[in-house]
């Protein structure tokens, strides 16, 4: 059984946000268009970076590796899904990073406190497709954790957006090495 995991398509990661990735808004629309046509998913879930007090994950002088400018703060518009993302098919949202930095969707829990992996296993999911922002950070971590947890994993590369070309190329190679299948949505 296959599920789609939509990673962090939030206002702060799209143009105009505090940690914007170029192409984020267009990606939100593209994922919505894809969902309107895709019929082979038994489940669709999403992740959100959702910070309350993440400690040294936030910094006034970020290194953009382990520390970042404030972003996706709980209760702010930046933490909301981008308005171009159609959320009607999303069954559950998994919130990560409330009190620490978190990159993988598998570090997240839903509103009932259920971790993503448990949620997927309870529904018999054994295959996942991963899309979203950012290819070189949260998408990569989510995909690699999916493989580590025994799920057949594909990243739909054309439905991801990365921070920079160099780090995205490196992340794609790391995912390939980790047995993540890299494919296009069409």
Curated annotation (Swiss-Prot):
Optimum temperature is 40 degrees Celsius for the hydrolysis of nicotinamide. Below 25 or above 70 degrees Celsius, the enzyme loses its activity rapidly. The keyword Metal-binding applies. GO terms for molecular function: ferrous iron binding; manganese ion binding; nicotinamidase activity. Changing residue 71 to A: 100-fold decrease in enzymatic activity with NAM or PZA as substrate. The mutant has a low metal ion content. Changing residue 59 to A: 2.4-fold decrease in enzymatic activity with NAM or PZA as substrate. No effect on metal ion content. Signal peptide: none annotated. It comes from the Bacteria. The active site is at 8 (proton acceptor), 96, 138 (nucleophile). Fe cation binds at residues 49, 51, 57, 71. Keywords: Antibiotic resistance, Hydrolase, Iron, Manganese, Metal-binding, Pyridine nucleotide biosynthesis. Pfam families: Isochorismatase. Its EC number is 3.5.1.19, 3.5.1.-. It catalyses: nicotinamide + H2O = nicotinate + NH4(+); pyrazinamide + H2O = pyrazine-2-carboxylate + NH4(+). PncA contains Mn(2+) and Fe(2+) in a molecular ratio of 1:1. PncA has only one metal center. It is believed that PncA binds iron in the natural state, although both metals can support enzymatic activity. CDD domains: nicotinamidase. Catalyzes the deamidation of nicotinamide (NAM) into nicotinate. Likely functions in the cyclical salvage pathway for production of NAD from nicotinamide. Is involved in the activation of the first-line antituberculous drug pyrazinamide (PZA) by converting it into the active form, pyrazinoic acid. Monomer. Most pyrazinamide-resistant clinical M.tuberculosis isolates contain mutations in the pncA gene, causing lack or reduction of PZAase activity. This is Nicotinamidase/pyrazinamidase.
